[in-house]
Amino acid sequence: MQKVTLGLLVFLAGFPVLDANDLEDKNSPFYYDWHSLQVGGLICAGVLCAMGIIIVMSAKCKCKFGQKSGHHPGETPPLITPGSAQS
């Protein structure tokens, strides 16, 4: 009895596959042209990569690592001094 029930369940679970559309149905709203999508993505990635390299190498993007930030007006005293942590 269990084998018959299992066979029936497997048949019913696979039944919707028989009614499925063909994968190459180009009129289906769920058909995607994956090759064109991949080529377009690679072109976009190449253009963005080239633009990033050009921006990094250009003279207009100068980073000044030698300057100290002007945020701090002076050196602040340490909050914990030696000997102040005793109770």
UniProtKB/Swiss-Prot annotation:
Substitution effect: C63S: Abolishes glutathionylation but does not affect interaction with ATP1B1
Transmembrane segments: 39-59
Membrane protein topology class: Single-pass type I membrane protein
Gene3D superfamilies per UniProt: Single helix bin
Post-translational modification: Glutathionylated.
Keyword annotations from UniProtKB, A to Z: Cell membrane, Glutathionylation, Ion transport, Membrane, Potassium, Potassium transport, Signal, Sodium, Sodium transport, Sodium/potassium transport, Transmembrane, Transmembrane helix, Transport
Similarity field: Belongs to the FXYD family.
PANTHER family the UniProt entry points to: FXYD DOMAIN-CONTAINING ION TRANSPORT REGULATOR 3, SODIUM/POTASSIUM-TRANSPORTING ATPASE SUBUNIT GAMMA
Primary role: Associates with and regulates the activity of the sodium/potassium-transporting ATPase (NKA) which transports Na(+) out of the cell and K(+) into the cell. Reduces glutathionylation of the NKA beta-1 subunit ATP1B1, thus reversing glutathionylation-mediated inhibition of ATP1B1. Induces a hyperpolarization-activated chloride current when expressed in Xenopus oocytes.
Name of the protein this chain belongs to: FXYD domain-containing ion transport regulator 3
Organism name: Homo sapiens (Human)
Annotated gene: FXYD3
